[in-house]
Amino acid sequence: MSHLGYEIKKLGFGLMRLPKRGDNIDVEQVKVMVDRFLADGFTYFDTAWAYPGSEDAIRQALVERHPREAFQLATKNAAWIKCKSREEAIGQFETSLRQTGAGYFDFYLLHNLGESRTRFFDVFNMWDFVQEKKRQGLIRHVGFSFHSTPEELEQILSAHPEMEFVQLQINYGDWENPAVQSRACYEVARRHEKPVIIMEPVKGGMLATPPEPVVKIFRKANPQASNASWAIRFAASLEGVITVLSGMSNVAQMQDNLSYMKDNLSYMRNFAPLSAEEHTTIQEAQKALNSIPLIPCTTCNYCAKVCPNDIGISGSFIAMNYLTLYKDKRAARVQEQWLVGGHGRQSADKCVQCGVCEAVCPQHIAIRDELVRVHAALGDGQLAPGS
């Protein structure tokens, strides 16, 4: 289906979690992934100024190696990250042009609108700036990504009908999650007749390795289908979807996704939505998943960008979720040591309870309380709330 003048297939390459070689992005592996993605007929690539090294990597792997008209490139402006003036916010756009070498952006997004973050785009008048760049031909289509309430989304779309699309977090785990409200936000966008780009369809990888009760449900319904494919197909089955972004971190993950997006070899080059029976399977999985109390962290690491003590928040939460799911304290501690200390971060007990992280968390996690819980479960002692 055509959206905004493009024929874009239902899988987009999210460039937030690219493969690493040591501390750096493995550009050679990214080249292999890009080539395979394009060879199978997929063309949409999503990066951001705020994704460390991603724009440089996609310049080397994609822009410098393939015709510009062979792909669509999206990037984002995060005016709420360390911008004290309009000039600094505009500088992010100029940096993105330089780092990607793309010449223009097919899709340009105001990044992570919602709550206190939206006011930066208002104060710096980024709404007019992106329209100016569109008139100059440096941006083809303007939209925004969003992590907040349906009420706030309604306000933004009513105030800015010139926005052409919305990028929303939608997955079967968050469809009725009161902290995310995927369904309600999706319905607001559709009422405003805005096409939707879906992010976090696999919830930061959590739905690729769901708890065993969910795995059993999917295995019974289709033993050959991967867990991630169920999540991606759920999102792609919704009306008005431009594409579904999958943050693929290695060639194996891409192979799995492509196997469910290819022609009649499997499900989705000529895409067929989920059947009624498959929707019932998803509903059973939702019920099973919602009965397990996990920390809903997607490892976006926006919290890490603002934490004054450099706490390894997402790593701590991954380890805690592992403990919740698998009841293996030793393995969870090993995970915490690697994901936190092994990556140069501070442990949960170093949290000073300032709460800055909670203001930028797209998942609305009570981060301070959860860090207390992490330290109580995995640390050497107790961390008192409010200390």
What are these regions (language model features)?
Residues M1-F71, F129, R135:
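N-terminal binding-site loop/beta-alpha segment at the start of enzyme catalytic domains
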Residues Y6-L11, G41-Y44, P67-F71, G101-D106, ...:
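Short, well-ordered coil/turn segments that N-cap beta-strands
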Residues M16-E28, K76-E88, S116-R119, V214-A225:
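Active-site mouth loops of central-metabolism enzymes
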Residues A39, E88-L109, Q131-Q136:
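CE4/NodB-like, metal-dependent polysaccharide N-deacetylase domain
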Residues S54-E64, S85-L97, G101, T118-D128, ...:
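Distinct, well-ordered alpha-helical segments
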Residues E69-K82, Y108-H111:
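A short, structured active-site edge motif that brings together acidic residues
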Residues L113-T298, Y302-I311, G315-I318, L325-E336, ...:
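Beta/alpha (TIM)-barrel catalytic core signal, keyed to glycine-rich beta->alpha loops juxtaposed to Asp/Glu
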Residues Q382-S387:
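Short, basic, low-complexity termini and linkers enriched in Ser/Thr/Gly/Pro
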